[in-house]
């Protein structure tokens, strides 16, 4: 494990795979974790049961007992460890966004393809049963020909009113060198991934971004302010290669929204919509229903017959939690590693991570040029 923040839920997932998916071919063993702050790294290792710690990720990758690497660092510490894993022949999962920009992501993709190692980008919402069921319904023709995708991820980050508070410190999220993008990388990348997963490839975008808080107190000098270098919010209109239209929105300045990831897919025969704040439900509408009862209805998606629930240990109808999406995600990754097979189409590969970065870069370019941007490929 490289990193110790979002790595908490990743570690929880690794530890719980044998519980939820028992019996399994091979039980994951938490060997080592690396982090810059040794006090926090050691505390993290003790909490989750890692055997040893490293202050440098290079030592962790060289460790002969480490067979698989999970990269859970800020975006500026994604490409080097990932490429080093490829050179060492070790499969890896890298948290989203895959990189700070598409150029960096492409280098990671090329290294993975050259090495032939199993690679995965951490888009965990693909592994929510309701989302997976939406994918199945769309593929089975429930909505007919897809016409529109509408997606938004809105929240107010943790803290004293979160990032909307101008006194929230200028941490790595607000610097282009470490984050690459702001809200669109942190939140919008999930919507971009779901749009591609559910509808198909995006061919062109027109975007707008805004930075509402221009300066913030420095982390180590609170009386001094520094410039915010990334966006607080972004919106984009998109065209899909199959002719569908879409909208994408991301903002970490949305009071009242805790973790509001929502998408709606409409077709010529029906519609599907999902809200992460109601994670177990999928709303569906079919034009085949009688007119007097036609409309959205809720489907509880945690029965054994629903995708991602076939081997889940919870009783039929019991609630599925956000953290469980990581259990499903990492179990899928582990299965692909042991079988030496690609993580796609269920999971997101480095190619998906690269395309995601390409779209984010295009949205920012569109804001700068005030033009539609056509995507390569």
Annotate each language-model stretch with its function.
Residues 1-48:
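N-terminal Rossmann-like dinucleotide-binding module
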Residues 22-23, 52-65:
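Short acidic low-complexity segments
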Residues 28-30, 66, 146, 202:
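Core-facing hydrophobic residues within beta-strands of well-ordered domains
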Residues 68, 74-127, 141:
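Beta-strand-loop-alpha-helix segment that lines the small-molecule cofactor/substrate pocket
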Residues 125-228, 282, 370:
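Predominantly a Rossmann-like dinucleotide-binding segment in NAD(P)-dependent oxidoreductases
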Residues 189, 249-258, 318-321:
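Glycine-rich phosphate/pyrophosphate-binding beta-alpha loops
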Residues 214-231, 235, 239-242, 263-264, ...:
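C-terminal glycine/acidic-rich active-site capping loop/insertion
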């Amino acid at each position: 494990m490289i990193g110790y923040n979002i790595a908490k839920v990743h570690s929880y997932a690794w530890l719980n795979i044998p519980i939820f998916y028992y019996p399994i071919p091979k039980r994951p063993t938490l060997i080592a974790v690396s982090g810059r702050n040794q006090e926090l790294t050691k505390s993290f290792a003790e909490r989750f049961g890692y055997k040893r710690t490293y202050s440098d990720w290079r030592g962790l990758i060289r460790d002969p007992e480490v067979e698989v690497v999970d990269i859970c660092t800020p975006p500026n510490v994604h490409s080097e460890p990932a490429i080093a894993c490829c050179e060492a022949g070790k499969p890896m999962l890298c948290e989203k966004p895959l990189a700070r920009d598409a150029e960096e992501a492409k280098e990671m993709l090329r290294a993975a393809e050259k090495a032939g190692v199993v690679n995965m980008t951490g888009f965990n919402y693909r592994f929510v049963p309701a989302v997976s069921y939406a994918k199945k319904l769309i593929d089975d023709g429930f909505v007919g020909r897809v016409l529109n995708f509408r997606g938004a991820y809105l929240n107010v980050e943790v803290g004293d009113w979160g990032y909307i508070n101008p006194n929230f410190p200028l941490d790595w999220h607000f610097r282009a060198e470490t984050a690459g993008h702001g809200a669109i990388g942190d939140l919008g990348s999930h919507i971009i991934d779901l749009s591609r997963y559910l509808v198909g490839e995006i061919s062109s975008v027109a975007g707008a971004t805004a930075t509402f808080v221009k300066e913030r107190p420095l982390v180590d000098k609170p009386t001094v302010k520094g410039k915010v270098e990334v966006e607080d919010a972004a919106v984009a209109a998109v065209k899909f290669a199959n002719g569908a239209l879409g909208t994408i929105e991301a903002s970490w300045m949305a009071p009242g929204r805790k973790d509001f990831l929502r998408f709606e897919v409409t077709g010529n025969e029906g519609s599907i919509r999902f809200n992460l704040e109601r994670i177990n439900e999928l709303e569906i509408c079919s034009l085949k229903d009688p007119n007097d009862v036609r409309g959205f209805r809720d489907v509880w998606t945690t029965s054994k017959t629903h995708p991602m629930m076939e081997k889940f240990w919870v009783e039929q109808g019991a609630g599925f939690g956000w953290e469980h999406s990581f259990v499903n995600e990492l179990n899928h990754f582990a299965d692909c590693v042991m079988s030496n097979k690609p993580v796609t189409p269920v999971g997101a590969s480095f190619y998906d991570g690269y395309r995601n970065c390409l779209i984010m870069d295009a949205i920012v370019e569109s804001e700068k040029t005030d033009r539609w941007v056509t995507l390569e490929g």
